[in-house]
Design a protein with these regions (language model features):
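Single conserved hydrophobic/aromatic residue that forms the stacking wall/gate
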Residues: 1-5, 9
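Juxtamembrane helix-entry segments on the extracytoplasmic side of multipass membrane proteins
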Residues: 6-7, 32-41, 64-70, 142-167, ...
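Helix-helix packing/entry segments at the starts of transmembrane helices
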Residues: 10, 41-42, 80, 84, ...
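Specific transmembrane alpha-helical segments of multi-pass solute transporters/efflux pumps
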Residues: 18-23, 52-103, 139, 227-245
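Transmembrane alpha-helical segments that form core, pore/gating elements
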Residues: 24-27, 51, 110-112, 116, ...
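Hydrophobic/aromatic residues within transmembrane alpha-helices
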Residues: 29, 39, 43, 90, ...
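Transmembrane alpha-helices of multi-pass small-molecule transport proteins
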Residues: 31-82, 109-110, 167-174, 188-207, ...
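Hydrophobic transmembrane alpha-helices of multi-pass small-molecule transport proteins
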Residues: 51, 113, 122-144, 199, ...
Length: 312
């Protein structure tokens, strides 16, 4: 059991690491010919094709109830359309630093929604873990002096990034039972199919005027990474965790993204890794550990059948 749990945590870490790399790579791609709406289209269409191909080549042929097909539509709106559109367009307007700061709100919003809709207890460990993780993430983001000095924020972009976090938090909270009923590939192929149908009518003009021949090969490589690694593979890994873990734990791994950004910054010579960065990383991992150790609603019911006292 511990080995299986460890594997799930590793997948969550890998997914968030891919999303951490997506911000600088996606921002660079949008600075060299790929518009924000075009990148959203590539992500939706590319991932839909990948998941359908995986379904056809593998053993993922599942019958989906008509009601669940409708539910997949709404799940796709929250997890893909609102989340990806708002974040990608927001990233094109604001700085990667501001976008990263806004992502730290996801665990907080998810904890509140899980308490309201799933009756998950807001325990001391959970609150302390989220607080430690947020402080660590903010230290990493704001400690990147080069990015902080050269990144210009934009209120509209920041609000779009915040909307993306809120929509994904609602998705994590409301659709957990639906996701548990089907394989990851079945869930994703329908969600991305619906997302593609909704997105393309609004983005096809951007695709039509895209200067395909003038876009450098490096930009296409960055776009391919965003589509295949940060969308297709990352969603597979994230969904595996969503099926087994509580929503707040899944969202806590969002704090891994600033760590990846810090590593990239140091590797490219744009940042340094000192004691403050080391302390920030420890705070992030300590926060994630505290949340994973916090007791769920089921745990508290087992310990106190007559009541649930959120003290740990």
């Amino acid at each position: 059991r511990s080995s299986a749990a460890s594997d799930v945590y590793k997948r969550q870490f890998a997914a968030c690491a891919a999303w951490g790399l997506m911000s600088p790579l996606g921002k660079d791609a949008m600075a060299h010919g790929i518009s924000g709406l075009a990148l959203v289209s590539f992500r939706a269409v590319g991932a839909a094709l990948c998941f359908w191909l995986t379904s056809l080549l593998g053993r993922h042929k599942e019958d989906v109830a008509p009601r669940d097909l409708l539910m997949f539509f709404f799940a796709g709106m929250l997890a893909i359309v609102f989340n990806q559109c708002c974040f990608t367009i927001g990233l094109s307007l604001t700085s990667p630093v501001n976008a990263s700061i806004v992502t730290t709100t996801l665990p907080i919003v998810t904890m509140i929604l899980a308490a309201l809709f799933l009756k998950e207890p807001v325990t001391n460990k959970k609150v302390l873990g989220i607080f430690c993780g947020a402080i660590g993430a903010l230290l990493l983001i704001l400690g990147n002096g080069h990015a902080a000095q050269n990144g210009n924020g934009n209120l509209t972009g920041d609000l779009l990034c915040l909307t993306a976090q809120c929509s994904f938090a609602v998705y994590l909270t409301i659709f957990k039972k639906l996701i548990q009923k089907y394989t990851v590939v079945t869930c994703m192929k329908w969600m991305f199919t619906y997302a593609t149908i909704v997105i393309l009518p609004f983005t096809y003009k951007d695709l039509a005027i895209l200067p395909w021949a003038e876009i450098p090969a490096t930009t296409w490589f960055e776009t391919a990474f965003v589509v295949f690694v940060a969308t297709y593979l990352a969603y597979i890994m994230m969904m595996t965790g969503q099926k087994l873990l509580r929503p707040t734990i899944v969202s806590m791994y969002n704090y891994v993204q600033p760590i990846v950004a810090c590593i990239v910054s140091v590797a490219t010579g744009l940042g340094v890794f000192g004691w403050s960065q080391g302390a920030a990383v420890l705070l992030v991992f300590g926060g994630v550990w505290l949340v994973t150790q916090s007791k769920s609603r089921a745990d508290l019911k087992t310990e106190h059948p007559s009541h649930t006292d959120p003290e740990s």
